Amino acid sequence: MTQPLPWEKNTAAPVPPAPEPVPLDAYTAPAAPEPELVPLDIYDAPVPAPKPAKPLVDIDSLNPAQREAVLTTEGPLLVLAGAGSGKTRVLTFRIAHMLGDLGVKPWQVLAITFTNKAAAEMRERLAALIPNGTRGMWVCTFHAMCVRMLREDADLLGYTGQFTIYDDDDSKRMVRDIMQALGIEQKQFPINMIRSKISSAKNAMIGPEDMLKSADSPNDKKAAQVYMELERRLRAANAMDFDDLLVRTLELLRTRPEVLDKYQERFRYISVDEYQDTNHVQ
């Protein structure tokens, strides 16, 4: 037998021995423990109520009577108290509570004051209580409210939206001119008396014709005559005096149901400061 040459020898690596067989259960993970059984009745236990959110308005800073007024937000509410007792503070806290804690929208609130200064102070107080939360809310005087309404719908009463507002001096000047044109002597019929009677009639919703019919004194008759001419001239000039702003707005709301519905739908909460000073038309 021929011997293989040296370079023909098998130089392959030796074959390693076969691994020992491993039991099958060595690869099986240990079984997880059985879960504990939970009694069924724990799912029926009452869920604790969430803690109420802290009010945005510091109600605790109010006395019991003030707190009751602030928290009474539905239905009519009349606050009777002496001067300096905090009525305006209650009013502003009540509005802030509605906006900040109850989710009332700013445009649903109308707050009325008697002076521009009081309106500005109320806006400042509300801004301090709820910063950036009063946009769209009306905080104004009766006359300013009426101007806003009339600017939008005065055409329904025969005016244009750009009507002129006569201040006290303008009105007095026009009454003086009318008295001169009618030959009414100011010495016998003082202009302030004439204007006062006309203003009272307007705020009682009495027109010049009705005033003349019911006049039972020379003063009332002269005032009614001036009143009639004053109305004619104001209409011709597309103008209103301060009394007209109130009277025409009331006329608008009484004679135009669609306008009344619009504002009733918008203003869900109306607050009036110094309500005891309001007159009939207000």
Residue ranges: model-predicted function:
Residues 2-12, 16, 21-30, 34-57, ...:
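A basic/glycine-biased coupling hinge at the interface between accessory DNA-binding modules
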Residues 59-74:
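N-terminal pre-P-loop "Q-motif" helix
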Residues 64-67, 93, 280-281:
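Short alpha-helical elements of helix-turn-helix
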Residues 74-94:
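Walker A/P-loop
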Residues 273:
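Charged catalytic and DNA/RNA-contacting regions of genome-maintenance
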